[in-house]
């Protein structure tokens, strides 16, 4: 049960739009996970966002995440962006990552 505030919904729309415009074809998936996805968020909860991309190094990931944080400036939105390549995300599955298991259980795809 996805529980986003109006400000979080606006932020998410703006971030998705930015990624589609600036990085066309690079993003494979955007999902919300954690308390916002489970429906048990508190007023001070952050917005956990998983972004899976086709490929890219840490410089590219930084270029993807920085605008997300910039878009939150002056709002009540506190994004926590987690960017993985599809290969890295698959590797977490192969190694039975607890983080991946939690994300898989809770996540709500939004793109």
Language-model segments: what does each one mean?
Residues 48-51:
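Short beta-strand->loop micro-motif that forms the acidic, two-metal-ion catalytic signature
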